[in-house]
C-alpha cells in the first residue's frame, strides 16, 4: 500500500515539481546553509571564469537535491545534462554522456551511489583531470584511446552518502547536506504552491500542513493536494484550518506527522517489547516490512523527532513515544 507520507515521487509529482521549481538561489526556500555556501563558490568560479568544483548533495528523499542542481546550473548560466546511477549500466554509457558535454556544462547524476563500480572508475580521471582512457576494439586489435574532456561540473545526489566509495567521495570539492525543513520554510512553500496553482488557503491551514509534513516539501505539496480535494467536496473550496484537520485525520496523519505505519512501529516496540531495546530485523518481521524499508523510510524521521533512540543493543521507544500514543509511563521498562 502506498503511503501518503512516502518521500519518493508518486504519479504526476515529477511534472508538478518541475512546475514549482525555483530558478535561482534567491527563489529557493530553505536550506540556507547550503545556499550561502554555494552562492560564494559560484560567484568565485564565475569571477575566475572557471568551472565550479564538483558538488555532492546528500540527504533524505524529497528535500530538493534535484531542484538545487538545476538552480546551480542556472546560476552558472550553463546547460545541465541529467541522468541517474541506475541508468548508466556500463562504462560506454558514461563515456557517451561525457563526450557530449560542452565547456562549463553541469552533469547531474541522481542516485549516484547506485552506479556500477566499473562505471564509477571511469569518472575518476574525468572528474580530476578532465580526460578518459577508453579501450577500442577487442582481443589483439584492442587499443587505448585518450579522450580529452572540456571542463565540467559533476553534481551527484544521494540519499545514502555512506555507500559512496572513498575515491569517488574525495573527488567532490563541495558537499551540501540537505536537511529537513523548518516549519516556517515549509509554510512558505505551501503558500507559494497554493498561489501558483490558485488554491484558496488561509495561513493557519498552511502552517498546520507544514507541521505535519515531516520536514519535507514533497510531502507538504502532496498533502496540500489532498486537503484541497477534501475542501472542494466537503466545503466551499477554501482550505481552512478546520478542513485541514479533518482531511488529515481522514488520511491518518496525526499532529506530529506520523501515519499508521509509524504508529505501528512504536506500538509494536511498546506493547511487545516493553519499549525495547529491540533489533531492527526483529522489528521489521513483526510489522511485516523489509528491514531496509524500515531503516531508510520510517526510522530516520522517528529518530529525528525523538520517538526512537538507537542503542548498541537495539532500538528503544522514548518517553515522548509513550506520551504521544497515550501509554502510561509506568509500563516502560527502565
Curated annotation (Swiss-Prot):
E.C. number(s) listed in UniProt: 3.6.4.-
Subcellular location: Cytoplasm
UniProt remark on domains: Has 3 domains, the large (RuvB-L) and small ATPase (RuvB-S) domains and the C-terminal head (RuvB-H) domain. The head domain binds DNA, while the ATPase domains jointly bind ATP, ADP or are empty depending on the state of the subunit in the translocation cycle. During a single DNA translocation step the structure of each domain remains the same, but their relative positions change.
High-level lineage: Bacteria, Bacillati, Bacillota, Bacilli, Lactobacillales
Sorted UniProt keywords: ATP-binding, Cytoplasm, DNA damage, DNA recombination, DNA repair, DNA-binding, Hydrolase, Nucleotide-binding
Region span, Head domain (RuvB-H): 255-334
Protein name in UniProt: Holliday junction branch migration complex subunit RuvB
Biological source species: Streptococcus uberis (strain ATCC BAA-854 / 0140J)
Pfam family, one: RuvB_N
Region Small ATPAse domain (RuvB-S): start-end pairs: 182-252
Binding site for DNA: 291, 310, 312, 315
InterPro entries per UniProt: AAA+_ATPase, AAA_lid_4, DNA_helicase_Holl-junc_RuvB, P-loop_NTPase, RuvB-like_N, RuvB_C, WH-like_DNA-bd_sf, WH_DNA-bd_sf
Gene Ontology CC: cytoplasm; Holliday junction resolvase complex
Similarity comment text for this entry: Belongs to the RuvB family.
Keyword hit for Cytoplasm: yes
HAMAP family in the record: DNA_HJ_migration_RuvB
Amino acid at each position: 500500500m502506498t503511503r501518503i507520507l512516502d518521500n519518493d515521487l508518486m504519479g504526476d509529482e515529477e511534472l508538478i515539481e518541475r512546475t514549482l521549481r525555483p530558478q535561482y538561489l534567491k527563489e529557493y526556500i530553505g536550506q540556507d546553509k547550503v545556499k550561502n555556501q554555494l552562492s560564494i563558490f559560484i560567484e568565485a568560479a564565475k569571477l575566475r571564469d572557471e568551472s565550479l568544483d564538483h558538488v555532492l548533495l546528500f540527504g533524505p528523499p524529497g528535500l530538493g537535491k534535484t531542484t538545487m542542481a538545476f538552480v546551480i546550473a542556472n546560476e552558472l548560466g550553463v546547460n545541465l545534462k541529467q541522468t541517474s546511477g541506475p541508468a548508466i549500466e556500463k562504462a560506454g554509457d558514461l563515456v557517451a554522456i561525457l563526450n557530449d558535454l560542452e565547456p562549463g556544462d553541469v552533469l547531474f547524476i541522481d542516485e549516484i551511489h547506485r552506479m556500477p563500480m566499473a562505471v564509477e572508475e571511469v569518472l575518476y580521471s574525468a572528474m580530476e583531470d578532465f580526460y578518459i582512457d577508453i579501450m577500442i576494439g577487442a582481443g589483439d586489435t584492442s587499443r587505448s584511446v585518450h579522450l580529452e574532456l572540456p571542463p565540467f561540473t559533476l553534481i551527484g545526489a544521494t540519499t545514502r552518502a555512506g555507500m559512496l566509495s572513498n575515491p569517488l567521495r574525495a573527488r567532490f570539492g563541495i558537499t551540501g547536506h540537505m536537511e529537513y525543513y523548518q516549519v516556517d520554510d515549509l509554510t512558505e512553500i505551501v503558500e507559494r504552491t497554493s498561489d501558483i496553482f490558485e488554491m484558496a488557503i488561509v495561513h493557519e491551514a498552511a502552517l498546520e500542513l507544514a507541521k505535519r509534513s515531516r520536514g519535507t516539501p514533497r510531502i507538504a505539496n502532496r498533502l496540500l493536494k489532498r486537503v484541497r480535494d477534501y475542501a472542494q467536496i466537503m466545503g466551499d473550496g477554501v482550505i481552512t484550518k478546520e478542513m485541514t484537520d479533518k482531511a488529515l485525520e481522514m488520511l491518518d496523519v496525526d499532529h506530529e506527522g506520523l501515519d499508521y505505519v509509524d504508529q505501528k512501529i512504536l506500538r509494536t516496540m511498546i506493547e511487545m517489547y516493553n519499549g525495547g531495546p529491540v533489533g531492527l530485523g526483529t522489528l521489521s518481521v513483526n510489522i511485516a516490512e523489509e528491514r531496509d524499508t524500515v531503516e531508510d523510510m520510517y526510522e530516520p524521521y522517528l529518530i529525528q523527532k525523538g520517538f526512537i533512540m538507537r542503542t548498541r543493543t537495539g532500538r528503544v521507544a522514548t518517553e515522548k513515544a509513550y506520551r504521544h500514543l497515550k501509554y502510561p509511563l509506568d509500563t516502560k521498562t527502565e
